[in-house]
Amino acid sequence: MTDQAFVTLTTNDAYAKGALVLGSSLKQHRTTRRLVVLATPQVSDSMRKVLETVFDEVIMVDVLDSGDSAHLTLMKRPELGVTLTKLHCWSLTQYSKCVFMDADTLVLANIDDLFDREELSAAPDPGWPDCFNSGVFVYQPSVETYNQLLHLASEQGSFDGGDQGILNTFFSSWATTDIRKHLPFIYNLSSISIYSYLPAFKVFGASAKVVHFLGRVKPWNYTYDPKTKSVKSEAHDPNMTHPEFLILWWNIFTTNVLPLLQQFGLVKDTCSYVNVLSDLVYTLAFSCGFCRKEDVSGAISHLSLGEIPAMAQPFVSSEERKERWEQGQADYMGADSFDNIKRKLDTYLQ
């Protein structure tokens, strides 16, 4: 159907790889809808050309040059830059209905039935179920709605600093008005919830249609071994409870996306990695007396797409942490997050 579309957003080349895997997974499961990606100026020209091979439309979005109220809103609230770009999806009035999907989602089955739903249909957020998660939602493009969202963003901002806060404020009746607009969790299965409610995942996980890689570590931040089809992370990722979803992401990437990136010169041919090693590298590698050629070759044949975003972790003593708690300054987004506290309790209860 040409008047309905799946829409995603990429703000840089790293997220573009996620968008490419998402688009490939939608095609793999034979969607009949058009595929649209919104891209910001930070996406390179070469990557845009790759996106054009997977998506039916690549729409450049630059809020600063938009010439509409989005520009004025950005001037007033510069912290909402990416959020305003995502809200731009409501301006795609060439489509009668769309499903927005974040670039860190992966489709596991055909989900064209989502277009039978009405605006705004979304799944509950695992952190606060009375709010919906904005990683997957059904909406109806409208200039009027778009302008109303921009006005809300300008006047009130976002309670969580992102699009999810604005959208939950705008569609505030979602929690109580119409249960038909509550998508089953299988349409937005968050990687975090797999850990927090493992028994439910064991029962219902096989029915999942969309997995959402929430959190700081994204699939493209892992290192993938094509020979063993395994993934690993340089940083400890407590949410990697079920790596089969990550492996599935990488399988689609290596099969469908990697050849395109190589074709457009964005990734060197992985088969030639060993051959281009200089004599100096080999000399240094073998000088320790313990390294074997096959070990070095294997190590550099692994695929790694990007660094994990740096996250400052200053040392805080137990006494300092206790004082902060007593002063109401707990680090709810970091060391004192619910997941970290739960893991600590689990170790004592085992």
From Swiss-Prot:
GO MF terms, alphabetically ordered: glycogenin glucosyltransferase activity; glycosyltransferase activity; manganese ion binding; protein homodimerization activity
PTM comment: Self-glycosylated by the transfer of glucose residues from UDP-glucose to itself, forming an alpha-1,4-glycan of around 10 residues attached to Tyr-195. Phosphorylated.
Cofactor entry: Mn(2+)
Primary localisation category: cytoplasm
Binding residues annotated for Mn(2+), in chain numbering: D102, D104, H212
GO terms, biological process: glycogen biosynthetic process
Segments of this protein annotated with the region Interaction with GYS1: 301-333
Role summary: Glycogenin participates in the glycogen biosynthetic process along with glycogen synthase and glycogen branching enzyme. It catalyzes the formation of a short alpha (1,4)-glucosyl chain covalently attached via a glucose 1-O-tyrosyl linkage to internal tyrosine residues and these chains act as primers for the elongation reaction catalyzed by glycogen synthase.
Annotated disorder: Glycogen storage disease 15: A metabolic disorder resulting in muscle weakness, associated with the glycogen depletion in skeletal muscle, and cardiac arrhythmia, associated with the accumulation of abnormal storage material in the heart. The skeletal muscle shows a marked predominance of slow-twitch, oxidative muscle fibers and mitochondrial proliferation.
Designated name of the protein: Glycogenin-1
Organism of provenance: Homo sapiens (Human)
Gene for this chain: GYG1
